[in-house]
Amino acid sequence: MKFQNTSGAVALALLSLAFAPQPAAAATVITDPAAFVQSVYARLAKGGDYIPPEDIYTPHLAALWALEGREAHGEVGRIDFLFWIDGQDGTPTDLRLRTVPVEGRLDRRIVVATFKNGEQAEALKFYFQKGVSGWKLDDVVSLKGQAPWTLSVILKYGWVD
């Protein structure tokens, strides 16, 4: 039996695999808004640099994020904090969640999150809209903290005094 030198062929095959297109990350599907919010806070409570996925927004909120990014011209932009914790850093503790239905609209839901970021008591309302690809985050409103805010307003107009 005659053996051929296959090391070159093996190397070429491995090299082509290394540069082959990788499958895209699976899209985030939110089947339960409260469970999703809970999972984000569980990850944030562990510390580190966890950033929630970017494909969780309604087209309206996604467009405002894109606008904010374009108008920032590579700089920090209008959002200079992690809205999930209403701060630049910190670890959320004492999380409590409550789901509020929207009267007459089964495709809308509000999740109210109360927690502490350090010693600061926080309360955020997460507004979700259900579409063909599941639930998507449509807006966030801070009810406590240092200064109340609405995410969509900051993204479009900046901080309004």
Sequence positions of predicted segments:
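Short, solvent-exposed secondary-structure junction/capping segments
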Residues: A45-A72
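Bacterial N-terminal signal peptides that target proteins for export
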Residues: M1-A11
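Short, aromatic-enriched amphipathic alpha-helices that serve as compact interaction elements
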Residues: V29-D49
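Low-complexity, intrinsically disordered terminal/linker segments enriched in charged
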Residues: G104-R109, N117-E122, D139-D161
